[in-house]
Swiss-Prot record:
Keywords: Aspartyl protease, Cell inner membrane, Cell membrane, Hydrolase, Membrane, Protease, Transmembrane, Transmembrane helix
Organism annotation: Shewanella sediminis (strain HAW-EB3)
Pfam family for this entry, one: Peptidase_A8
GO cellular component terms attached to this protein's record: plasma membrane
Name this polypeptide is given: Lipoprotein signal peptidase
Catalytic activity: Release of signal peptides from bacterial membrane prolipoproteins. Hydrolyzes -Xaa-Yaa-Zaa-|-(S,diacylglyceryl)Cys-, in which Xaa is hydrophobic (preferably Leu), and Yaa (Ala or Ser) and Zaa (Gly or Ala) have small, neutral side chains
InterPro entries per the UniProt record, alphabetical: Peptidase_A8 (IPR001872)
Residues passing through the membrane, by range: 12-32, 67-87, 94-114, 133-153
Catalytic residues in the record: D123, D141
Length: 176
C-alpha cells in the first residue's frame, strides 16, 4: 500500500472532479434551455431530449413510489466511499483501475446530486435508429459505464507488467 496519498490512486481524483463538473454543467444547461420532453435533433441518429429519470439505469424502479431515491442515494455514497478507499490503497501507476474507479465515483456523485436536488436524474442524450430509441442518459451515466467496462477489462487483462512483477516477488518469497 502506498505510504502517502500522492503515491496512491487518489492522485487520479481530478477525474472525479472533471466528470462531476462536466455532468453538472451539461445538466444545468439542459434545465435552463429545454422544457421537459423537448427534443432537438442534432444528427440523423442523435437528439438532445430532456427527460427525468426517477429510477436507475434504463429507468429501473422509476415507478416504485419514491423510496428508490434513498436506495440509490445509499448505493452512490457506499460505492463512492468503497472506491475511494480502494484508490487510497492502489499505487498511482495502476492507471486502468484508478481511471475506472474515478469515472464511477464522478458519475455516481453527479447523479447523486441530481437525486438530492431535484428528486430525479436529468437525462438528455438520446440515440436512436429509425423509430427505436435507446434509453436517454447523461454524462454521469456514460462515465459509470466506461468505468465499469474498464474494471471488467482489467479483470481479464490487468497490467501485465505488474502481474509479472508480483509473480517474481512471489517466486522470490517462496525460495527464501
Amino acid at each position: 500500500m502506498p505510504t502517502n496519498w500522492k503515491d496512491s490512486g487518489l492522485r487520479w481524483y481530478w477525474v472525479v472532479v472533471l466528470v462531476f463538473i462536466a455532468d453538472q454543467v451539461s445538466k444545468q444547461w439542459v434545465l435552463t434551455n429545454f422544457e421537459l420532453h423537448e427534443s432537438v435533433n442534432l444528427l440523423p441518429f442523435f437528439n438532445f431530449t430532456y427527460v427525468r429519470n426517477y429510477g436507475a439505469a434504463f429507468s429501473f424502479l422509476s415507478d416504485a413510489g419514491g423510496w428508490q431515491k434513498w436506495l440509490f442515494t445509499f448505493i452512490a455514497v457506499a460505492f463512492s466511499t468503497i472506491l475511494t478507499i480502494w484508490l487510497r490503497k492502489q499505487p498511482t501507476k495502476v492507471w486502468r483501475l484508478n481511471l475506472a474507479y474515478t469515472l464511477v465515483i464522478g458519475g455516481a456523485l453527479g447523479n447523486l446530486i441530481d437525486r438530492l436536488q431535484h428528486g430525479y436524474v436529468v437525462d438528455f442524450l438520446d440515440f436512436f435508429w429509425n423509430t427505436s430509441h435507446f434509453a436517454a442518459f447523461n454524462i454521469a451515466d456514460s462515465a459509470i459505464c466506461i468505468g465499469a467496462g474498464l474494471i471488467i477489462l482489467d479483470s481479464f487483462i490487468g497490467d501485465d507488467k505488474e502481474k509479472s512483477q508480483n509473480g517474481q516477488n512471489d517466486n522470490n518469497a517462496a525460495k527464501e
